[in-house]
């Protein structure tokens, strides 16, 4: 069986399968392309052509899982939170800045220091590793764990929405 025949036979059913699991149509199309690239690369290694249907759907399922896994890790917090300091700055941004800075103070020292140096003072994670005398991967882990802990604390006390660039677009302190 060649890739063109597989495309003719499977592209519509796979597109439907992916669409039931992913809402964004452009992502559906991207994932479908990735699936067929994987099929093309690994087709010569297929041992039992009788099981090609389940093989193709397994590739599709794993591709969707990989998509959500990478999406989840990239959504923890943006690399840097940006605060608009213009004269017409909205009140919630000021409140959010105060809330986030005070919440960061509740973090363990090593995470607090990592976030203050990277997110507020603008150091790169490489510069952070040099300043603290730790490995680069250690610095990356420390920043990521700090952001995770900060997110947990903030989710318990505040509602914060950020756009895809990390700009705060909505903020409210939750009633206790």
Curated annotation (Swiss-Prot):
Keywords: DNA-binding, Sigma factor, Transcription, Transcription regulation. CDD domains: Sigma70_r4 (cd06171). Residues 125-144 bind DNA. It holds the Pfam family Sigma70_r4_2. A motif (Polymerase core binding) lies at residues 30-43. Gene3D superfamilies: 1.10.1740.10, Winged helix-like DNA-binding domain superfamily/Winged helix DNA-binding domain (1.10.10.10). The keyword DNA-binding applies. GO terms for biological process: DNA-templated transcription initiation; regulation of DNA-templated transcription; response to stress. SUPFAM superfamilies: Sigma2 domain of RNA polymerase sigma factors, Sigma3 and sigma4 domains of RNA polymerase sigma factors. GO terms for molecular function: DNA binding; sigma factor activity. Sigma factors are initiation factors that promote the attachment of RNA polymerase to specific initiation sites and are then released. Belongs to the sigma-70 factor family. ECF subfamily. This is RNA polymerase sigma factor SigZ. It comes from Bacillus subtilis (strain 168). The gene is sigZ.
């Amino acid at each position: 069986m060649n890739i063109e025949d597989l495309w003719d036979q499977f592209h519509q059913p796979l597109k439907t399968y992916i669409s039931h699991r992913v809402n964004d149509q452009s992502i559906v199309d991207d994932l479908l392309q990735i699936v067929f690239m994987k099929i093309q690369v690994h087709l010569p290694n297929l041992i039992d052509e009788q099981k090609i249907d389940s093989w193709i759907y397994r590739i599709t399922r794993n591709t969707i899982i990989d998509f959500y896994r990478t999406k989840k890790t990239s959504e923890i917090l943006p690399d840097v939170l940006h605060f608009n300091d213009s004269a017409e700055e909205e009140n919630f941004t000021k409140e959010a800045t105060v809330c986030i800075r005070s919440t960061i103070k509740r973090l363990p020292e090593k995470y607090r220091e990592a976030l203050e140096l990277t997110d507020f003072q603008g150091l790169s994670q490489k510069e952070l590793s040099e300043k603290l005398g730790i490995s680069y991967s250690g610095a990356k882990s420390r920043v990521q764990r700090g952001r995770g802990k900060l997110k947990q604390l903030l989710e318990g006390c505040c509602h914060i929405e950020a756009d895809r660039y990390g700009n705060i677009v909505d903020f409210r302190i939750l009633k206790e």
